[in-house]
């Protein structure tokens, strides 16, 4: 913005409100090499001269550096025209001849030195001869001439060299064909420069571009050329593109992902810690202010005492329950084993009684029986017939108390059979039955039966 304001200030000066090479007003282009302002048409001609002769910039559309602003301040349209007038060059002189003159070269050096702050002394003035370009040959009546530069001699090299020059426009060709002897400003000729001058200009161009390339190498690459950066683009070799290594890309992406994840985790942990610390401080301050810390400690002590007391009571209750459970398990185990033994003995006694009845019937049919045996048998049958579902519990108890002899001898084993004769009068049937069984066994031993009874059955 500061550069634009300075340019506007310079442009608002009276001598800079008109183009330096023509009468066009309000010029919007400038030549940094001379510090002058020009119109659009003349700026195109200046661009054709080359940047080493005239470096053209737009006042509004281009960016300007500090050194360029200083060159514009050191120059000016009126100063340039006065300087050229000392060398005999008028304002209406052709742009090509004007700015390729020795006076233009001296003025460029003068502007460069003043912008850089170096002292400058103008050299002695040597007026230059104003050489007019040769007039065009031929017209409508002389179109067949080989030297007229018309379309009939388009393949003639000599005519082409004499008429076709750089910066020669279509208007120049029309002027040369329409008006014989007319003066064309923008048309150059071989008579303007000698061979030695052209060779010197070529050598100067090579040195100029070499110097420009050396200066460009020393400039930074991060800035645009308008701000003093390095020229990189058309006409120069750019840096080779870096090789794309997929493995490096993957590792870089993974490392960046882990790095970002670690940063997020660290920030989250820091935020959580700060929040917890703030909440803890607030809670502690409120507790201390309200006197809740003493109440909380008392409550904790009471809860601890109650918990200990309840624990002791619970442990005592659990010990009592475990002792009761152990006692009950032992009682149930003993009762189960006793009932199993009694059931086995009842089954054995029942089988013995039935088998005894069968043997009694057989003995009575073979050798005759005693009246007591028959009465006992009848009594047993009566007792069996009287066995019903109404008295099944009483009969079961009676069977449990009944005992059978273990051997054929008259002596009985008292182990486990004590109190077997302590029965009521209603159990006489079982006593008779036992006596019958003893008589049968003795008869068997005396007679034909050799069966012996053991605790497990017959042998």
From Swiss-Prot:
PROSITE patterns: ARFGAP (PS50115). Residues 180-193, 420-431 have a biased composition (Basic and acidic residues). It comes from Arabidopsis thaliana (Mouse-ear cress). It comes from the Eukaryota. This is Probable ADP-ribosylation factor GTPase-activating protein AGD6. Residues 142-153, 345-359, 381-392 have a biased composition (Low complexity). GTPase-activating protein (GAP) for ADP ribosylation factor (ARF). Gene3D superfamilies: Arf GTPase activating protein (1.10.220.150).
């Amino acid at each position: 913005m500061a550069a634009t304001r300075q340019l506007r200030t310079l442009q608002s000066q009276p001598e800079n409100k008109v183009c330096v090479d023509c009468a066009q007003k309000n010029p919007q282009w400038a030549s940094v090499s001379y510090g002058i302002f020009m119109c659009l048409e003349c700026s195109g001609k200046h661009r054709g001269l080359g940047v080493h002769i005239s470096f053209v910039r737009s006042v509004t559309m281009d960016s300007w550096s500090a050194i360029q602003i200083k060159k514009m301040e050191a120059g000016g349209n009126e100063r340039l025209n006065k300087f050229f007038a000392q060398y005999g060059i008028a304002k209406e002189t052709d742009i090509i001849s004007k700015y390729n003159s020795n006076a233009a070269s001296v003025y460029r050096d003068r502007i460069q030195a003043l912008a850089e702050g170096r002292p400058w002394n103008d050299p002695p003035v040597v007026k230059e001869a104003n050489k007019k370009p040769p007039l065009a040959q031929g017209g409508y009546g002389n179109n067949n001439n080989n030297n007229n530069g018309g379309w009939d001699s388009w393949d003639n090299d000599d005519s082409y060299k004499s008429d076709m020059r750089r910066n020669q426009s279509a208007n120049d060709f029309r002027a040369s064909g329409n008006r014989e002897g007319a003066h064309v400003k923008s048309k150059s000729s071989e008579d303007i420069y000698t061979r030695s001058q052209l060779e010197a200009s070529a050598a100067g161009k090579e040195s100029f571009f070499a110097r420009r390339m050396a200066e460009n190498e020393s400039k930074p690459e991060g800035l645009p050329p308008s701000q003093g950066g390095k020229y990189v683009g058309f006409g120069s070799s750019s840096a080779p593109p870096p090789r794309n290594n997929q493995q490096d890309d993957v590792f870089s992406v993974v490392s960046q992902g882990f790095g970002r994840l670690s940063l997020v985790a660290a920030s989250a942990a820091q935020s959580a810690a700060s929040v917890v610390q703030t909440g803890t401080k607030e809670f502690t301050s409120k507790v201390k202010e309200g006197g809740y810390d003493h109440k909380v400690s008392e409550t904790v002590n009471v809860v601890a005492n109650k918990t200990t007391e309840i624990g002791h009571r619970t442990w005592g209750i659990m010990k009592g329950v475990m002792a009761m459970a152990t006692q009950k398990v032992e009682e149930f185990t003993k009762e189960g084993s006793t009932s199993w033994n009694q059931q086995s003995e009842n089954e054995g006694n029942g089988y013995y009684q039935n088998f005894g009845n069968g043997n009694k019937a057989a003995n009575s049919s073979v050798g005759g029986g005693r009246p007591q045996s028959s009465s006992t048998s009848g009594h047993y049958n009566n007792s069996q017939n009287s066995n019903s579902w109404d008295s099944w519990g009483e009969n079961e108890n009676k069977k449990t108390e009944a005992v059978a002899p273990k051997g054929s001898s008259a002596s009985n084993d008292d182990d486990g059979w004590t109190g077997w004769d302590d029965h009521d009068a209603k159990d006489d049937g079982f006593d008779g039955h036992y006596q019958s069984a003893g008589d049968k066994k003795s008869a068997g031993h005396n007679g034909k039966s050799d069966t012996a009874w053991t605790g497990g059955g017959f042998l």
